[in-house]
């Protein structure tokens, strides 16, 4: 049987990022053959990823990549905020974003397939389920800028614009803070407006106001509603005395489109009863 040296284990660990004991066991199984040991670990990594696939991944980070006139914003999920802060996990998320910008995949499934080997490797290293939840690519003749909020990288935006990068970045910060649904009123679908109009009309009628007054109330509320949900209509967070549209115009900048994500939006997190887990473990 081949001798398994500390250097062999260290080299395999450096190549795979896995634990010392896992690497040593793989080398023993491979009878000292480095390539075979690496293959064994890759196979086991895939099996481990499969076992973890059913576990909810609701934490994670956002990452972006801009490759010329192509930009991508991605959300990559894991199970705990502890792993979300791990440098290896963050590096994987950045790799996913770079891959999305370079390859411009048509779906999450296609992007996931492109990064599957790297996903299995980081799952094997960190021991949590991970997944590419969503992404968006903007391929444009215009300019692109991204803003990721805070060290935890859980909220962010990719902005397509014309004009000043500094101004566009400030507007990106506003988008993360104020959460507009779209750029302008023209992008709000008629069904949404009519639904709001119906609600406001019923409220006005119920208040007993005269018809002409009620109609003015409804139109006023519609204008307020549109201002609240559109980027251009919102009061600019850095100067509430002007709208984003006014700030943009006076600084020679126009936002064409944006995509905004917040990690975990819409994912139901499983409540963990740690006391029950400890009690169950004590019975084993």
UniProtKB/Swiss-Prot annotation:
Offer a single GO CC term for the protein.
Answer: cytoplasm
> What CDD domains does the database record attribute to this sequence?
UBA_EF-Ts
Q: Which GO terms describe its biological process?
A: translational elongation
- PROSITE patterns according to UniProt: EF_TS_1 (PS01126), EF_TS_2 (PS01127)
Main localisation: cytoplasm
Assigned keywords, A-Z = Cytoplasm, Elongation factor, Protein biosynthesis
Gene3D superfamilies tied to this protein: 1.10.286.20, DNA helicase RuvA subunit, C-terminal domain, Elongation factor Ts, dimerisation domain
Question: Where does it localize?
Answer: Cytoplasm
Annotated spans, Involved in Mg(2+) ion dislocation from EF-Tu: 80-83
For whether the record's keyword set contains Cell membrane, the answer is: no
A GO molecular function term, named singly, is: translation elongation factor activity
Provide the family line. Answer: Belongs to the EF-Ts family.
What does the function comment of this entry state? Associates with the EF-Tu.GDP complex and induces the exchange of GDP to GTP. It remains bound to the aminoacyl-tRNA.EF-Tu.GTP complex up to the GTP hydrolysis stage on the ribosome.
What is the protein's name according to its record? Elongation factor Ts
